Amino acid sequence: MEPITHFLTGACMGRAGLNRKTALATLTLTLAAEAPDLDVLGRLRGSAFGFAHHRGFTHSFLGVPLDAVVVVGFVYLIWLLRGRRVKDPNLPPRWELLFFYACLAGLSHILLDFTNNYGVRPFWPFSEKWYSWDIVFIFDPILFSFLLLGLIVPSLFSLIDKEIGARQRGPRGRVAATMALIAVVLLWTLRDFEHRRAVAALQARTYNGADPARASAYPDLDNP
């Protein structure tokens, strides 16, 4: 997926409740959700090198902990530069938990990239095999909208409450972010159904009088 979708996913994970366990959770999850794409720095050594190593080690199960170390180290540096201040003094950073969260966010990146038609190599360097679900284009406006709304809707309601003088009730941010993540899973379910139906339709056809040896269907922006 494109970077903004990954950032939004990490932010929703934090707002869904993980930020209640430790300070700096949402920041860590947001950065870690996009951290595997640091492999784009390989393009500095040339386009061929960058292409060959994209979605390689940083997108593998073996690379997730290393990605997490980089992110948590960066967040730790920010924390130090800010004088070790956090929003809630009663909720200090729990670095071992932040590392775990960073790993979860890294896995979310692999999962999102697995759903599109480019795929991932999660078992690299032990296997160069690519795996892809082929149900989502690299940018899906509906999925993107779910995640974005899950983050901004609570803020809009808060502004309305302040404008009319109403008292805010309940953890709107947590509910909205959780609903956004659930909506993404439901969208995947629908897209999987549509993908299977498209593949079945292709397999049912004959080509020059012969049955297809293999049929595949790939989403794009105009026809997800």
Region locations from a protein language model:
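N-terminal membrane-targeting hydrophobic helices
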Residues: 1-197, 201-213
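Short periplasmic/luminal acceptor-recognition loop of GT-C membrane glycosyltransferases, typified by
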Residues: 216-224
